[in-house]
């Protein structure tokens, strides 16, 4: 989790969504992060890290760009 504090952007694939946002598996660390916003499973996205909670190991992000849409 400390790794997310050093980087402010990450790239990954959407693995699931709910009514609030989407869960993304980070390509570099293989960790799952959350962003508030719309998406679809399989989308490739770039995110900006907004908050890292080391106690609960939660990373909250915002969507920067959709790199590719799910097929």
Give, region by region, the residue ranges found by the protein language model.
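Single-stranded RNA-binding regions, centering on S1/OB-family and related RNA-binding modules
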Residues: 1-71
């Amino acid at each position: 989790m400390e790794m997310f504090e050093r980087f402010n952007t990450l790239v990954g694939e959407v693995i699931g969504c709910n009514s609030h946002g989407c869960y993304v598996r980070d390509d570099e660390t293989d960790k799952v992060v959350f962003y508030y916003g719309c998406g679809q499973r399989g989308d490739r996205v770039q995110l900006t890290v907004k908050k890292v909670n080391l106690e609960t190991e939660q990373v909250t992000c915002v969507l920067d760009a959709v790199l590719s849409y799910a097929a």
